[in-house]
Amino acid sequence: MSTLIQLKINPTMPNTVDSVLNSLFLSSETKSLLILEKWINELCETHSISSEKYGNILIAVTEAVNNAITHGNLNVIDKKTIVSYALNDKALSFFIKDEGNGFDFNNLPDPTDPANIETPDGRGIFLMRHLSDDVTFHNEGSFVEILFDL
């Protein structure tokens, strides 16, 4: 059974950065992914993350946020996605929380199955799992933790 994790989403703070909490609050729109990319760039530069790790981080976290916006928040612009991170000398972890109801993350189609090869979506979680060192879902899937060993 997964642990219940709650983050309060503040609807009055679209697309803002809380540097004390290392958090980014995003509205559910495509341009939020550009804001996320800039935030990840700055974070990785500030903390001297290797270029090899940077690419994996950028793709995996962007996939998670895109899923949160599209599938969790259903592209409802007033719904927010919170992205935060924690860093120590061994790992960099990202936490992505949306306002959706979650999903059955234990019952996903295999994107490498020949029947799914031509399907236009369904690869985000597969990429997240292969580009990071650990992916953990909480709150029935509306909260994801992605860990990168350093």
Positions of predicted regions on the chain:
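Structural signature of the histidine kinase catalytic ATP-binding subdomain
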Residues: 28, 49-52, 76
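Conserved beta-strand-loop-beta-strand hairpin that lines the nucleotide-binding pocket
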Residues: 2-22, 69-150
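Short alpha-helix lining the ATP-binding pocket of the histidine-kinase-like ATPase
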Residues: 62, 66, 70
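Conserved short strand/loop->alpha-helix "switch" segment adjacent to the catalytic nucleotide/phosphoryl-transfer site
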Residues: 40-62, 117-118
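Acidic-residue sensor for enzyme active/binding pockets
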Residues: 37, 63, 145
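STAS-typified acidic loop motif
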Residues: 22-34
